[in-house]
UniProtKB/Swiss-Prot annotation:
<keyword id="KW-0479">Metal-binding</keyword>
<dbReference type="GO" id="GO:0009570">
    <property type="term" value="C:chloroplast stroma"/>
</dbReference>
<dbReference type="GO" id="GO:0010109">
    <property type="term" value="P:regulation of photosynthesis"/>
</dbReference>
<feature type="region of interest" description="GAF">
    <location>
        <begin position="116"/>
        <end position="300"/>
    </location>
</feature>
<feature type="transit peptide" description="Chloroplast">
    <location>
        <begin position="1"/>
        <end position="79"/>
    </location>
</feature>
<dbReference type="GO" id="GO:0051538">
    <property type="term" value="F:3 iron, 4 sulfur cluster binding"/>
</dbReference>
<dbReference type="InterPro" id="IPR053334">
    <property type="entry name" value="Chloroplast_Sensor_Kinase"/>
</dbReference>
<comment type="subunit">
    <text>Self-interacts. Interacts with the plastoquinone analog 2,5-dibromo-3-methyl-5-isopropyl-p-benzoquinone (DBMIB) and with SIGA/SIG1.</text>
</comment>
<comment type="similarity">
    <text>Belongs to the chloroplast sensor kinase protein family.</text>
</comment>
<feature type="domain" description="Histidine kinase">
    <location>
        <begin position="312"/>
        <end position="602"/>
    </location>
</feature>
<dbReference type="GO" id="GO:0004715">
    <property type="term" value="F:non-membrane spanning protein tyrosine kinase activity"/>
</dbReference>
<keyword id="KW-0411">Iron-sulfur</keyword>
<keyword id="KW-0418">Kinase</keyword>
<feature type="binding site">
    <location>
        <position position="121"/>
    </location>
    <ligand>
        <name>[3Fe-4S] cluster</name>
    </ligand>
</feature>
<dbReference type="GO" id="GO:0046777">
    <property type="term" value="P:protein autophosphorylation"/>
</dbReference>
<dbReference type="GO" id="GO:0048038">
    <property type="term" value="F:quinone binding"/>
</dbReference>
<feature type="modified residue" description="Phosphoserine">
    <location>
        <position position="188"/>
    </location>
</feature>
Amino acid sequence: MLLSAIASQTLLSSNPNLHFSNSIPNPRPSNPSLKLLNASSSSSSSSSSSIFTRGLRYVNHTVSNEESEPGGGETMVASASAIASAIRGASTTPVEFTQMIEKDHLKTKIILPSPDFQRLCLEQLDLFRQIVDPNAVLSIYVRPAGSYVMDRLELRRVTCYPSVNAGDVVILVGNFGIPAGLRAAEASLSSQQVELVSKHRAAVFPMVKHPFVVGFLVAELPVEAEEEEEEEEEEKPHGVNQFLSPEEAYALPASANTKSPRVKLPSVKVFTEEQRSYAINISRTLAMAYVMDQKTMLLQQSSWQNNVRMSKLVEQIRGPLSTMRTLSKMLSTHTKRNQISHDIVEDLIVQGDQIKDTLEELQDAVHLTKANIVRHNEEALKKINKTHNETRRSKYEHKDPIDGSQISSTRLSLGSGLDDSEMPMPPLALAPLQMHSIRPCDISNVLLDMVETVRPLALTQQRVVELGENSASLQVAVEEPALRQALSNLIEGALLRTHVGGKVEILSTRAPAGGSLVVIDDDGPDMRYMTQMHSLTPFGAELLSENMVEDNMTWNFVAGLTVAREILESYGCVIRVISPRSSDAALGAGGTRVELWLPAFPAAVSEANEA
């Protein structure tokens, strides 16, 4: 009796919510399509005639970008699946991948690279097809700017050539089993020039801008002509020899004419040395172009944010300045030389203090503008008279001892252990902006957890991370996930700025005017040193130099600070940057201090007042 079975084609990645993890690969394809070749017989044939079917052949099914299951579930994009396989191969820890497809990125407000970069991608991919393979399907995946300091890997497909649903944005997110798994996989991928994924018949080129992997170039290669001929030969029917007489059928063993199933894995086209070199150079060109594009967009965003912030600070200065002018006119009109009212003098002092505080914030805002960074180039720094600056700074310290930005190095040190150290000046206003649906968190618990997590990684890099002993347990009006993301940006930026043997100190305490104060100090280069390389100048010539430590340092500092500021300011927090933090340090080695002023949760404030 002949049993007919039709095996439905089921794709492993057809479920968009399916998580991929590191597992031992099955030697047989995970999604075979079982086909019974033509073995037709009439329905009226007698039971004495027996038909021997041929062996089952495994057919690898290549999924197109638009293909889906009959049930309606979306399949995983082939290029994304190839990247996932390459990352799993480079990772020493389990990795789970999820895929999302945004049909309209304008409504979801997903930030994509500039149109200039996307046009450059199309030109480079067209060059790839001309030189390497004219039938290759090429895709470019890049990492968004805010993902470099996270424990997960996020990739977005920005270009697919030839275009297949060009308006769709494919987002691939990889979650690593341990926080350090991403860094280890990134280091392994950075050392590889190309990864061949036979399962998907693709070549994955990491786009590396040391020390980061900024994206991937995926080339899905066509089937070789020899493979097509073999498949056609296997699919040809064998005609009369396929049907045996009853005597022959009973005379032969059952396995005599039955071929065992053969597993044929797809092969990847072998590049010539010249094609391989061209492909690697194209991936490097795209990596460098993406870095410059991100820096340009970061500068535009930072400049816009600083312009908004500066306009608000100017309005804050205008009120006290008008009051001071009015009081000055009153003094000149109603008093004689030796008859100055004490109340008027006190008002002048208060208004002067407000202007001083606002000017400090204005200085911090101006410190990171594009014009300021470009202005502090290498030639200008060489002309700085160090002795003159130190003399002028010492005069300011004696004249205005309550200026928080001019505190001496002993007061700025968090490791001194002095309980009576002078506190920085608080901001003018510190209140939560989102009163509703905020779940408060304990800042000390968050800092303790993050320091314990980052400490092993810092030790492997020969750096030290310390949390102040007198860190207070305080409730702040900031969501814990947002606070963790902002702090991870700032702490990792501080670690990247320090040299081997460097130190990062973190302290949290109660702010003088309410709320919490978190101080992050590092002993790395200060902003005067980090801005001397034209590091944020778009299309700067220094990007082609070999020693790019300062460039990466500044890029991560500004990127991390921008991300943290955008997150925390939405909760009413204030971020201040003091660089150099040590006035008596050598030129360029003054370190950086980052102050985070976090508003307290209203319930915590009322409990503190009752106590």
